[in-house]
Amino acid sequence: MKIIFTKVLFDNYVWIMFNSSKDCIIIDPGESNSVIKKIKKLNLNPKIILLTHNHLDHIQGVKNLLYKYPEISIYGPLETQFCGTKNLIDNRNTIEILNTKFYIIPTPGHTNGHTAYYCPPFLFCGDSIFSGGCGRVKNGMMIKMYNSLRTISKLPNDTLIYCSHEYTRSNLEFFKKIFPKNLNILNYYNNIKKSKTQCTLPSTLKIEKKINPFLQLNNTNLRHQVKIHNDLSFSLNFFIYLRKIKDKS
């Protein structure tokens, strides 16, 4: 399987996975025109759409793709049913599409039904985790997002992180100010800032465990750099604190 992307809207990535027969899977089409253009250019045959959650910047290309390719099958959580999902994955552990197995990983927090698709070593994770950060959390779902990130962190270190937004530079620019002594964050930020390549993805889980504070919640050195009075002795409290200060930025 090969994976390519097309950039849509402002900073969204639509990932396209295809096999030797040029049958392809489209992940989170937030817009359709760029996707169709890419498909035609490479002579791909769209067979499947995978949706991670129901936000418009991930689904608003579905309608036109379905009109253009009426035989396409759509997979997603229940919350995406309104946009044409016929193959619901909420109660499934795996799906097999294009002779390839995908593990279904519930990752609630950004939305209640948010789901990631894991086809080792590829993780299509939507807005759950970003390079250097994580998705905004829906009201009342801090614990769910915390647990979702813990689930992702248990995957193999060689897991390739295919998230849906190009936020790496802005995430690290923020966190290098919060954790100025963290050389992993600073060095990685400087490297991507110098790079002529705009796309910083995919990342790897191994890299994220070094540069992403949301995957270092048990790191006492990071906690000690945060000079506040809140009780940060527990990793959940540290996560909530980091997410709240990031939301204010």
Curated annotation (Swiss-Prot):
One of its GO terms (biological process) is methylglyoxal catabolic process to D-lactate via S-lactoyl-glutathione. Gene3D superfamilies: Ribonuclease Z/Hydroxyacylglutathione hydrolase-like. HAMAP family: Glyoxalase_2. GO terms for molecular function: hydroxyacylglutathione hydrolase activity; metal ion binding. Monomer. Thiolesterase that catalyzes the hydrolysis of S-D-lactoyl-glutathione to form glutathione and D-lactic acid. The keyword Metal-binding applies. Belongs to the metallo-beta-lactamase superfamily. Glyoxalase II family. The keyword Hydrolase applies. Zn(2+) 2 binds at D57, H58, D127, H165. SUPFAM superfamilies: Metallo-hydrolase/oxidoreductase (SSF56281). The lineage of its organism: Bacteria, Pseudomonadati, Pseudomonadota, Gammaproteobacteria, Enterobacterales. It catalyses: an S-(2-hydroxyacyl)glutathione + H2O = a 2-hydroxy carboxylate + glutathione + H(+). It holds the Pfam family HAGH_C. Its cofactor is Zn(2+). PANTHER family: HYDROXYACYLGLUTATHIONE HYDROLASE (PTHR43705), HYDROXYACYLGLUTATHIONE HYDROLASE GLOB (PTHR43705:SF1). Keywords: Hydrolase, Metal-binding, Zinc. Zn(2+) 1 binds at H53, H55, H110, D127. InterPro entries: Clx_II_MBL, Glyoxalase_II_hydrolase, HAGH_C, Hydroxyacylglutathione_Hdrlase, Metallo-B-lactamas, RibonucZ/Hydroxyglut_hydro. This is Hydroxyacylglutathione hydrolase. Its EC number is 3.1.2.6. The gene is gloB. Pathway: Secondary metabolite metabolism; methylglyoxal degradation; (R)-lactate from methylglyoxal: step 2/2. Binds 2 Zn(2+) ions per subunit.
